């Protein structure tokens, strides 16, 4: 089952990750505008709410593909021939797991207004770095050996 669904799931995972990268990038840009005295409250709230479902969706799609990846891609190819790609994947997955509470925190704290801004600013920038790293490293790993 996973073998037949792996490629469409990988494409959906990549598209969701790209949308997530766009949303986190836009949130950081909007927050930067606020730091410079040009607040965009509605955009900041919208991106804060959009990021959590995108993050959870991308994470869930990755988890769905993991059994196929682990057996058919990693065990048969990457571990033996490209161990650096296996290590990069492990780092990517662990870093993405750290992003889950940050994305959920943005979702819930993003509505609280000025009192929560220092926390949401930190969450947004950190999450943007995690997502950017995960997208780039995911593309590198897939270019070595995709599903």
Residue ranges and their predicted role:
Residues 1-147:
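Polytopic transmembrane helical bundles with strong interfacial aromatic enrichment
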């Amino acid at each position: 089952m996973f073998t037949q669904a792996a490629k469409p799931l990988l494409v959906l995972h990549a598209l969701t990750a790209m949308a997530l990268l766009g949303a986190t990038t836009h949130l950081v840009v909007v927050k930067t505008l606020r730091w410079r005295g040009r607040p965009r409250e509605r955009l900041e709230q919208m991106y804060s709410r959009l990021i959590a479902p995108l993050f959870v969706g991308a994470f869930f799609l990755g988890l769905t593909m993991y059994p196929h990846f682990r057996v058919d891609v990693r065990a048969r190819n990457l571990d033996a021939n490209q161990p650096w790609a296996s290590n990069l994947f492990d780092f990517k997955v662990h870093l993405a797991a750290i992003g889950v509470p940050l994305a959920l925190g943005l979702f819930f704290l993003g509505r609280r207004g000025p009192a929560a801004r220092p926390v949401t600013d930190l969450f947004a920038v950190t999450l943007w770095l995690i997502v950017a790293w995960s997208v780039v490293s995911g593309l590198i790993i897939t270019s070595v050996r995709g599903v």
